[in-house]
């Protein structure tokens, strides 16, 4: 039978529960325990698929096509384990399931209530994760902050859960904040005391406290927290701020988090093997090169909107012994001031996914600049579609080319709606989602990176390359290097007469791992590094001249 760890958060939101849950998962896996991590989100949306990136951050897509919270990306990257739609639960999905059951008569005419019907559905979802893959430990993160009205059904459900599966099969872990008060020149435990008091008022006594702080907790502070929160002093864990999230598992291992967890669950505390993770962190902390990459997007004011892209770039930078300087550039500002203003001193350009017409022309201009100036370029999803539009307008002599998403009456719809999307009305959960195969053409950049004939990547899109223009593109030098197995759907495009110019319809960032960077990102960063270390080249009327590269 699986054991269960429930992670709650107190004092403030964005306390880092997801990183703590993911780090615990890594520590347990280092002891050869299997782990699955579940996120319970208190918002009433069925999933985050239709939410604004400014409100929610990125939508992380699982292999089975679920649109989920970005924390699932942390879970996958830290544990190197793929999650599924079972690992993401929202209040909206719970209520939807209960109401559907009521409509079918499943409750035999009874009054449907939060207790027991909503709480039973929540418990059923937790058990479903355990039954699906039978992991040794299921870690469940409860979204929101203790005290929020939205979280109450989830907290009540996990309170009941312990009684039903056995006391020694469940522990409660509370992540909280110990703030430093500059005026008093001391750390304060009172917010944590009140947070634990709130948790205890609904029947949950935390077994472990994970204390977020910007400096070490001294022993006296731990003893105080132990006394007032009724937690053994050895279960008061310091989680001090770190320069990278990948340091957190090592910090928590040193503090004894995994040891305390296993002891409370009556599991063997096996010897951990964190040597690879330690090497990863050491390599990240001592880079030999500096590179600058421009990320040209629509939602650059909120970095979480592109979280997996940033992480994937970081993984590739670590692998190449490089320190990545990421320059966030608004596509709309490029429209106003021109691409050269922002891109003249970067080493590479990445255009990520997105939706809507705002900023599209700026992305197209950025891609044109990268192509003409021999800047390494990587396009993802909408980034690929923009590269197709750029090529059509500037090389294939179709100046009015556009995507049907942005201009329904364009005379040259080089990007068109997928046929299966023609009659779709609802927005939520209706795109081409999840893992699909891609067949890669030999003797292409894509094949040199993947070294495979068929790869599987995650998708999230409604529009595709319009095959009516494929011959016109290939005749002008554009290469279709990856397609669906039947050859119909264009998955990867590239321009061979360029140091590195490749774009894909899928989202490779979702498959990148700290210890195994994705091939497309590795290739991109290696090309960026090669350019950085070589004499600069500037395009002049399709020819290149070499200049001395000024040190920076």
Curated annotation (Swiss-Prot):
Q: What positions does the entry give for CTP binding?
A: 13, 148-150, 188-193, 224
The record's section on SUPFAM superfamilies has: Class I glutamine amidotransferase-like, P-loop containing nucleoside triphosphate hydrolases
Query: Which of this chain's residues are annotated to bind UTP?
Result: 13, 188-193, 224
Inhibition and activation profile: Allosterically activated by GTP, when glutamine is the substrate; GTP has no effect on the reaction when ammonia is the substrate. The allosteric effector GTP functions by stabilizing the protein conformation that binds the tetrahedral intermediate(s) formed during glutamine hydrolysis. Inhibited by the product CTP, via allosteric rather than competitive inhibition.
Copy the pathway line from the protein's UniProt record.
Answer: Pyrimidine metabolism; CTP biosynthesis via de novo pathway; CTP from UDP: step 2/2
Which keywords appear in this protein's UniProt record, sorted alphabetically?
ATP-binding, Glutamine amidotransferase, Ligase, Magnesium, Metal-binding, Nucleotide-binding, Pyrimidine biosynthesis
Q: Which residues bind L-glutamine?
A: 354, 382-385, 405, 462
Look up keyword ATP-binding and say if it applies: yes
Q: Which InterPro entries match?
A: Class_I_gatase-like, CTP_synthase, CTP_synthase_N, GATASE, GATase1_CTP_Synthase, P-loop_NTPase
Entry binding sites for ATP: 14-19, 71
Task: Please describe what this protein does.
Answer: Catalyzes the ATP-dependent amination of UTP to CTP with either L-glutamine or ammonia as the source of nitrogen. Regulates intracellular CTP levels through interactions with the four ribonucleotide triphosphates.
Protein's UniProt name: CTP synthase
């Amino acid at each position: 039978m699986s054991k269960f760890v429930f992670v709650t958060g107190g004092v403030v939101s964005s306390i880092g529960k997801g990183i703590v849950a993911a780090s615990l998962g890594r520590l347990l896996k280092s002891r050869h325990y299997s782990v699955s991590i579940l996120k319970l989100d208190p918002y009433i949306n069925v999933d985050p698929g239709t939410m604004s990136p400014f409100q929610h951050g990125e939508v992380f897509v699982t292999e089975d096509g679920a649109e989920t919270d970005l924390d699932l990306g942390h879970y996958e990257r830290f544990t190197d384990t793929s999650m599924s739609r079972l690992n993401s639960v929202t209040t909206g999905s719970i209520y939807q399931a209960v109401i559907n059951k009521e409509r079918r008569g499943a409750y035999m005419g009874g009054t449907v209530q939060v207790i027991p019907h909503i709480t039973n559905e929540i418990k059923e979802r937790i058990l479903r994760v355990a039954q699906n893959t039978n992991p040794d430990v299921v870690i469940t993160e409860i979204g929101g902050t203790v005290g929020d009205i939205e979280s109450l059904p989830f907290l009540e459900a996990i309170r009941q859960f312990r009684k039903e599966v056995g006391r020694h099969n469940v522990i409660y872990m509370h992540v909280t904040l110990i703030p430093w008060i500059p005026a008093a020149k001391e750390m304060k435990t009172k917010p944590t005391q009140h947070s634990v008091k709130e948790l205890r008022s609904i029947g949950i006594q935390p077994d472990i406290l994970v204390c977020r702080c910007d400096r070490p907790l001294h022993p006296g502070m731990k003893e105080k927290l132990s006394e007032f929160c009724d937690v053994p002093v050895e279960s008061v864990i310091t989680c001090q701020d770190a320069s990278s999230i990948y340091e957190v598992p090592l910090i928590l291992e040193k503090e004894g988090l995994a040891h305390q967890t296993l002891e409370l669950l009556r599991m063997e505390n096996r010897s951990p093997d964190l040597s690879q993770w330690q090497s990863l962190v050491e390599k990240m902390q001592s880079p030999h090169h500096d590179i600058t990459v421009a990320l040209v997007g629509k939602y650059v004011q909120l970095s979480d909107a592109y979280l997996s892209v940033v992480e994937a770039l970081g993984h590739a930078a670590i692998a190449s012994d490089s320190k990545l300087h990421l320059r966030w550039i608004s596509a709309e500002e490029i429209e106003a001031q021109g691409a050269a203003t922002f891109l003249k001193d970067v080493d590479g350009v990445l255009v990520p996914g997105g939706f809507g017409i705002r900023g599209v022309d700026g992305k197209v201009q950025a891609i044109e600049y990268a192509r003409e100036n021999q800047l390494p370029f990587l396009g993802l999803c909408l980034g690929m579609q923009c590269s197709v539009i750029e090529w059509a307008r500037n090389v294939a002599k179709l100046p009015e080319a556009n995507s049907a998403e942005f201009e329904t009456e364009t005379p040259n719809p080089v990007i068109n709606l997928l046929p299966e999307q023609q009659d779709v009305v609802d927005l939520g959960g209706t795109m081409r989602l999840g893992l699909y195969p891609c067949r890669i053409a030999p003797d292409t950049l894509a094949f040199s990176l993947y070294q495979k004939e068929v790869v599987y990547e995650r998708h999230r899109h409604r529009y595709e390359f319009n095959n009516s223009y494929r011959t016109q593109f290939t005749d002008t030098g554009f290469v279709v290097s990856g397609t669906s197995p039947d050859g119909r759907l264009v998955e990867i495009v590239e321009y061979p007469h360029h140091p590195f110019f490749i774009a894909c319809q899928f989202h490779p960032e979702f498959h990148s791992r700290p210890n195994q960077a994705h091939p497309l990102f590795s290739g991109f960063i290696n090309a960026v590094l090669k350019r950085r270390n070589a004499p600069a080249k500037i395009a002049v009327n399709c020819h290149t001249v070499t200049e001395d590269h000024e040190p920076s």
